[in-house]
């Protein structure tokens, strides 16, 4: 299998360098490495040129536009699979060997688990407990599996039927041929969830516990007004596109989004997001419930 490792980046030269070094250290080396550069201005292009790394530059089309271009290049250059990852994480040396050894014709995708680099038994993005339909459970306890030992109690053959794309996801060409490319209109947030559910239509999407991808803790990062907007809008779109009990999920989405925004920016900022003249949250909710995707707020 001819595998392309593809990274999407924007102004994270140091972290991107670390990720590229981790690709060089893979036991099973990728057959090509591509960086989609979303208009970086921090010397990324020069760094990649000095390493001789294949770079495709484009305007900042967000994560969704980056993944769309990476998959298009995979198809155009005749690769059998693409290994997709963001620029701020880095794979364990065994990761691609595990994934490429575990992929079968029956699977739509197999992905790494994403672990905190400062606490490598804890997930950056906790796994949901799943209901009988395979959706994240609303009423289970615990609803989230936050550590590797917790997930191990729920797995079969070291795999779990859910994945947090795109942090070490191996996607075969046959899956792309069947479902198409990532939808670039999502811009940021939700593109990976949309692709996950589209892939599940053609086969299982699994995370493999022995394929590890290390990543910074995202809970300490700023949550800007723009990020809140796209999180709310796109998650509401997805609730109605794929999920059971969408109204309950909508309420949870809005509550969780505003709580996270308040924790990082203060409760006054959260109240203004709902009640101020700009009312970014209200606009996001209205457009999300109308099913609108697209780049329609901020940068």
Residue ranges and their predicted role:
Residues 21-30:
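Short, acidic, metal-binding catalytic loop of nucleotide-sugar glycosyltransferases
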Residues 22, 35-46, 89:
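A conserved acidic beta->alpha catalytic loop
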Residues 45, 49-65, 69, 73:
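Conserved donor nucleotide-binding strand/loop of the catalytic core
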Residues 79-88:
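Short beta-strand-to-loop acidic/aromatic patch adjacent to the donor-nucleotide binding site
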Residues 94-135:
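Conserved donor NDP-sugar-binding/catalytic core segment of glycosyltransferases
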Residues 163-171, 175-180, 185-211:
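A short, conserved alpha-helix in the catalytic core of glycosyltransferases
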Residues 204-225:
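Active-site donor/metal-binding and catalytic loop motifs
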Residues 226-234, 244-299:
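Non-catalytic, C-terminal membrane-associated alpha-helical segments of glycosyltransferases
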């Amino acid at each position: 299998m001819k595998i392309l490792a593809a990274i999407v980046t924007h102004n994270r030269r140091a972290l991107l360098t670390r990720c590229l070094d981790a690709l060089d250290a893979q036991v099973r080396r990728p057959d090509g490495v591509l960086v989609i550069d979303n208009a970086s201005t921090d010397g990324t292009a020069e760094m990649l040129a000095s390493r001789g790394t294949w770079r495709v530059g484009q305007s900042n089309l967000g994560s969704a536009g980056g993944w769309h271009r990476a998959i298009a290049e995979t198809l155009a250059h005749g690769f059998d699979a693409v290994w997709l990852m963001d620029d701020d994480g880095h794979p364990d040396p065994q990761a691609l060997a595990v994934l490429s050894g575990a992929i079968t014709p029956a699977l739509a995708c197999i992905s790494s688990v994403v672990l905190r680099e400062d606490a490598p038994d804890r997930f950056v993005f906790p796994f949901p407990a799943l209901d009988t339909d395979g959706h994240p459970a609303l009423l289970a306890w615990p609803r989230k599996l936050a550590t590797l030992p917790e997930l191990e109690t729920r797995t079969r053959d070291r795999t779990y039927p859910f994945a947090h794309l795109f942090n070490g996801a191996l996607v075969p060409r046959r899956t792309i041929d069947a479902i198409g490319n990532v939808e670039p209109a999502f811009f940021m947030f939700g593109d990976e969830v949309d692709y996950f559910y589209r892939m599940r239509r053609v086969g299982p999407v699994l995370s493999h516990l022995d394929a590890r991808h290390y990543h910074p803790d995202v809970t300490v990062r700023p949550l800007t007004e723009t990020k809140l907007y796209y999180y709310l809008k796109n998650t509401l779109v997805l609730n109605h596109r794929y999920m059971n009990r969408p109204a309950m999920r909508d309420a949870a989405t809005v509550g969780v989004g505003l709580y996270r925004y308040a924790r990082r920016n203060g409760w006054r900022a959260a109240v203004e997001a709902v009640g101020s003249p700009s009312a970014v949250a209200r606009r996001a909710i209205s457009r999300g419930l109308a099913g609108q995707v697209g780049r329609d707020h901020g940068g």
